[in-house]
């Protein structure tokens, strides 16, 4: 493409001709030119550039058709280094235009159709169409997934999914295809089977986001695991486990509601699947060789976690409700849904120490505290692989997208000085932030979890009304963290059955949503009905499970799943030595030279 040098050359030629008449004299600047000199080179002014372009192209293609003066000027230019082997500019332009036309004829073309979407007209092979279909669902299947238990959220299905479906409309469902689905498969299956399978996988009650991850190895790992696993293939014992944990979550909420009506408890009614989710994370993280797990969370669901997971005694919680508890020892007088706890939980891989950090009212501010505690524990254990101590942060959907400390904590996740080998983030997504339900009023992104994309963390969305899917995605998240030592997000999408703190009436601000919620069965009822229908449990057994839980609560028995009954000294830290300690006491702070050298590496 002809640029500035071309016109600079024309101007230089004019100056040379002018200066040749004044050899031996000092060269004149353009500012000192006479009117006659300006007139003599006025044909080279900037206003004539378009004309000069065409004239020069004519000279290059047929020099005899232009006047002698112009021909002499262009001949003298062609003898300089800047203009040797010059080519016709218009031919360059035409060449590019032809390339664009050719590309437009071959590229993926879309035309408007009556339904307001698009249809591609480019003919593709069946193999190419199926490949496009698979890739579209892997990347955007989550936009069509059944993630909202209330079915209130309007789906914004990605255009690639719409096109992928239209692309295969003319292909016989009996066509046998083999396109690396499931990942690694060499077998051919009927097209109708492939479509049904991939829709259930990527647009069922699970929605996976991982196409934003730049590392192909990570993407392929997720695809391989997800497509070759069947989360619905669980045995009867696992189903009973899920049922009992849902009974625990729902049972505590109903008990507290009846015993302390109108009092704040910030329950997880509508997201009860959180309890089996956390139980599964503890079990799976322990299988991945974790010795300690540190939890951080705000008030939502905290009481349920304390009683049903960590093993806090029911009477201690009731005393906090009644505000007659002893302030001696570790009690601070803070509200019950801010207090921390720790215990040992027995898993199939041995005991694991679990801690829940104290938390103030300020949402998400506990996040960096948890990460700092985990890093300190890892350093104390010389845990260079960063798998002995694992952080799990439980967020609200509104606070995760709205609080700046979340982004700040995520930004430090892969740094050398502050990284902990990945955090498992769990979002209690009840689709309402205090009184705001419509995402258009609360954020500028499709999902509340989109902030995690900037560190390329995979995001696993799951419908909270499908506890079996919740269990599966918990295992997948824990295994991803173990494999890649990176953050991972579980978006547990449910609803909030009561008001913000059980003392308010949410129907005044969200009447449509809460009319739907009142008609919607709890996840416990839905799952119980499913198991009874499939003969996995009887109604009598279910009623007995409920009575047993209620009896344990009333008798002040621990209702946590697999709470360790044997004190493991290796997992307990003795804090008594720090109580009433002399803080100005001299302490040996020397470090061995080998340790310093090792740390420097």
Report each predicted region and the residues it spans.
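Cofactor-binding active-site loop characterized by glycine-rich and histidine/acidic residues
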Residues: 291-456, 460
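Extended, charge-enriched "interface" segments that sit outside catalytic cores
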Residues: 40, 77-273, 290
């Amino acid at each position: 493409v002809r640029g500035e040098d071309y016109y600079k050359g024309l101007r230089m030629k004019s100056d040379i001709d002018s200066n040749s008449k004044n050899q031996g004299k000092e060269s004149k600047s353009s500012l000192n030119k006479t009117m006659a000199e300006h007139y003599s080179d006025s044909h080279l002014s900037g206003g004539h550039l378009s004309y000069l372009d065409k004239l020069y192209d004519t000279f290059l293609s047929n020099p005899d058709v232009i006047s002698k003066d112009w021909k002499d000027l262009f001949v003298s230019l062609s003898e300089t280094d800047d203009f040797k082997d010059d080519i016709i500019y218009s031919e360059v332009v035409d060449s590019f235009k032809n390339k664009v036309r050719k590309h437009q004829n071959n590229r993926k073309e879309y035309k408007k159709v009556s339904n307001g979407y698009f249809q591609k007209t480019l003919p593709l092979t069946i193999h190419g169409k199926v490949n496009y279909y698979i890739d579209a669902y892997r990347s955007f299947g989550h936009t069509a997934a059944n993630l909202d238990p209330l079915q209130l959220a309007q789906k914004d299905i990605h255009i690639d999914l719409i096109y992928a479906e239209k692309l295969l409309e003319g292909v016989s469902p009996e066509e046998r295809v083999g396109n690396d689905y499931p990942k690694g498969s060499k077998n051919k299956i009927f097209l109708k089977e492939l479509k049904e399978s991939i829709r259930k996988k990527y647009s069922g009650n699970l929605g996976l986001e991982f196409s934003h991850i730049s590392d192909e190895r990570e993407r392929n790992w997720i695809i391989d695991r997800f497509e070759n696993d069947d989360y619905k293939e669980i045995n009867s014992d696992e189903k009973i486990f899920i049922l009992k944990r849902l009974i625990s979550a729902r049972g505590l909420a109903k008990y507290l509601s009846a015993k302390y009506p109108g009092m704040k408890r910030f329950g997880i009614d509508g997201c009860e699947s959180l309890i089996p989710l956390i139980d599964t994370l503890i079990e799976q993280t322990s299988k991945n060789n974790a010795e300690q797990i540190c939890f951080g969370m705000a008030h939502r669901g905290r009481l349920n976690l304390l009683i049903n997971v960590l093993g806090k005694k029911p009477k201690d919680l009731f005393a906090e409700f009644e505000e007659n508890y002893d302030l001696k020892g570790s009690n601070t007088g803070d509200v019950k849904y801010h207090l921390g706890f720790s215990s040992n939980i027995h898993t199939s891989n041995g005991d694991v120490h679990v801690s829940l950090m104290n938390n103030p009212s300020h949402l998400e501010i506990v996040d960096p505290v948890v990460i700092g505690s985990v890093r300190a524990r890892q350093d104390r254990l010389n845990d260079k692989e960063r798998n002995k101590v694992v952080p799990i942060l439980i967020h609200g959907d509104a606070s995760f997208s709205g609080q700046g400390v979340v982004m700040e904590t995520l930004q430090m996740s892969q740094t050398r000085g502050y990284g902990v080998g990945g955090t498992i983030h769990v979002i209690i997504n009840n689709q309402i932030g205090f009184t705001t339900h419509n995402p258009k009023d609360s954020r500028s992104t499709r999902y509340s979890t989109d902030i995690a994309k900037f560190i390329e963390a995979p995001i696993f969305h799951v419908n909270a009304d499908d506890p079996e899917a919740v269990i599966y995605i918990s295992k997948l998240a824990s295994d991803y963290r173990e494999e890649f030592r990176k953050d991972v997000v579980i978006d547990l999408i449910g609803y909030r059955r009561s008001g913000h703190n059980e003392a308010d009436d949410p129907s005044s601000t969200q009447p449509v949503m809460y009319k739907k919620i009142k008609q919607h069965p709890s996840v416990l009822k839905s799952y119980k009905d499913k198991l009874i229908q499939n003969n996995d449990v009887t109604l009598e057994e279910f009623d007995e499970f409920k009575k047993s839980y209620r009896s344990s609560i009333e008798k002040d028995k621990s209702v946590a799943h697999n709470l360790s009954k044997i004190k493991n000294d290796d997992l307990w830290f003795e804090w008594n030595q720090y109580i009433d300690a002399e803080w100005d006491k001299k302490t040996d702070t020397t470090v061995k030279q080998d340790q310093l050298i090792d740390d420097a590496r």
